Amino acid sequence: MTTEDTLTIAGRSYQSRLLVGTGKYQDFAQTRAALDASGTQIVTVAIRRTNIGQNPDEPSLLDFVPPSQFTLLPNTAGCYSADDAVRTLRLARELLDGHDLVKLEVLGDPQNLFPNMPETLKATRTLVDEGFKVMVYCTDDPIQCRMLEDLGSVAVMPLASLIGSGMGILNPWNLRLIIDQSSVPVLVDAGVGTASDAAIAMELGCDGVLMNTAIAGARDPILMASAMRKAVEGGREAYLAGRVPRKLYSAAPSSPTEGLIAAVK
């Protein structure tokens, strides 16, 4: 894979196609170690759950994950309405000195964390109008993804399966439809459980993968972060290389049948 094969979001290019969340680790030190092992350049931050300056008397994530070294992606985890999500991202922009690249998620159910698409579309429209560059967590419905792109999203992020489920890629066909129709990056968000899931997403043609639980919830988060880095890189290279067609039988022997050495009598 060449240095020219980069992930470009909102006009900025990145070498890594793996985006990593900062929640659920033992502490901020383990968070930083996992990020380093993953090779990520974009890290998501749940504004409602993580201190990035709101509470000056508490440890701040920014002391371990400084904006000078990573692109921070504030997200609206825990928001269940468009209004709540918009307020949260306005706060993030204020705390991060005008930072405008954000990840929107508006949830519809506290048990399965499935996205509420009507509220997501409403919030997207407002945020784009206010100058935010919005990456959107969404269903794997190609029509909804097209609507998000039409509203001005800089990336669509369909779930592979439910957040935190580790169930992997449940509907590769829908992902492929979304990839084929989209002119903005398509990143799998949610459901990745292990390295092979990340590789499959990349082999399908996704532009990147975002994960948190798959790394933070592993028995060895640092080792899993390293595994995910390799899986994303390997899956991307396999996609670019082009797999052989699936066939029940080979159309021809894999070894030549002419010019063979004659049997010794």
Swiss-Prot record:
Homotetramer. Forms heterodimers with either ThiH or ThiS. 1-deoxy-D-xylulose 5-phosphate binds at residues 164, 190-191, 212-213. Belongs to the ThiG family. GO terms for cellular component: cytoplasm. It catalyses: [ThiS sulfur-carrier protein]-C-terminal-Gly-aminoethanethioate + 2-iminoacetate + 1-deoxy-D-xylulose 5-phosphate = [ThiS sulfur-carrier protein]-C-terminal Gly-Gly + 2-[(2R,5Z)-2-carboxy-4-methylthiazol-5(2H)-ylidene]ethyl phosphate + 2 H2O + H(+). Pathway: Cofactor biosynthesis; thiamine diphosphate biosynthesis. The lineage of its organism: Bacteria, Pseudomonadati, Pseudomonadota, Betaproteobacteria, Burkholderiales. Its main location: cytoplasm. GO terms for molecular function: thiazole synthase activity. Keywords: Cytoplasm, Schiff base, Thiamine biosynthesis, Transferase. Catalyzes the rearrangement of 1-deoxy-D-xylulose 5-phosphate (DXP) to produce the thiazole phosphate moiety of thiamine. Sulfur is provided by the thiocarboxylate moiety of the carrier protein ThiS. In vitro, sulfur can be provided by H(2)S. It is found in: Cytoplasm. This is Thiazole synthase. CDD domains: ThiG. GO terms for biological process: thiamine diphosphate biosynthetic process. The active site is at 103 (schiff-base intermediate with dxp). It is an enzyme of class 2 (transferase). Transmembrane segments: none annotated. The keyword NAD does not apply. HAMAP family: ThiG. Its EC number is 2.8.1.10.
